[in-house]
């Protein structure tokens, strides 16, 4: 959900001013931590691509070299897209998201994360920056750490693997 509490998975939204500042700050942190980024790959969603561009500017990385990959999109929330989440959470559990009409299920997202992981490890570059989304990011972490995708249904697991906006998570 976005800062307004709306399910925004595949819905195109713009970065807020705060999101822009977070992206710039992430770029500055990365420049100190990993001064050499060989490649930036991001979700093709507008908010993610804009985040990647802001980070790239801070790194001095050419924006025209950012690769968009549809495997990195956020989980699709089906009929919940664009709706406020508070009402859903008052009557449902996280596992119920798999039953929302037209929503991507956790097993489907896990398969996509596996494909994304295979794509990323086959890139012939040392330092690849991936700019993606929270739910999908957790799925990718589970692939790398070999944690079963069913853990996404566990509230504590989601808290333990929560990814904040513009947060740096080093995987490999």
Q: What does each of the following model-derived ranges do?
A:
Residues 1-61:
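Active-site-proximal alpha-helix that buttresses catalytic centers in soluble enzyme cores
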Residues 14, 55-115:
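Phosphate-handling substructures
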Residues 26, 57, 61-63, 67-68, ...:
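Acidic, low-complexity terminal tails and accessory targeting/binding regions
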Residues 33-36, 120-126:
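Glycine-rich phosphate-binding loop signature in dinucleotide/nucleotide-binding domains
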Residues 36-44, 67-68, 127-131:
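Short glycine-rich phosphate-binding loop at a beta-alpha junction
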Residues 46, 72-73, 135:
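Catalytic metal-binding/acid-base residues of hydrolase active sites
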Residues 115, 120-123, 130-135:
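His/acidic metal-ligating clusters that form di-metal
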Residues 134-138, 167:
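GST superfamily/GST-like fold recognition
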